Amino acid sequence: MALNNRERITRAFDLLQEGLHDLVDEVMTRYFHTSDWPERMSAQDAQRYGRERRRLEKTDPQVQLRAITEYGREFSRELSRGQQSLASELRDTRNEWAHGAAFNSDDTSRALDTIERLLRAVNSMDSANDVRKLREDLQRTVYEDRTRKRSKPTNTASISASKGLKP
């Protein structure tokens, strides 16, 4: 059964989470000097914004993308600024996805392409290849839909001049 755009993005974010986990965990553990860095990050948020601590998970792509964008200097050995900007774009995409936004084919294709690029940047080739397959499937579906719309038979009526009428 064909996937819809939301399902494609959901699968891609699952693959992104897997692909980013090791790098983000390593860098953030080094920065916070503890493997429980999400707790430290949450404590900083609570202090900075004057609110209750929130439970953050290492495996949440929102937390991983936020780590890359907000602690960019810590990732500078692993990711260039351009590659880090992919994470910034994906934060917006992830927020739209989390809030139930609809994704057209162009937006979906861009999101899948950006996820694939970020996965390649962190050398998560298997996940990147899986995302590429999702994008290729989307492209195939779009092409088939457009071809089907163009080739639908149209009803035409032939009109011929009646005898006896002058042109």
Where are these regions (language model features)?
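Amphipathic alpha-helical interface elements
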Residues: 1-167
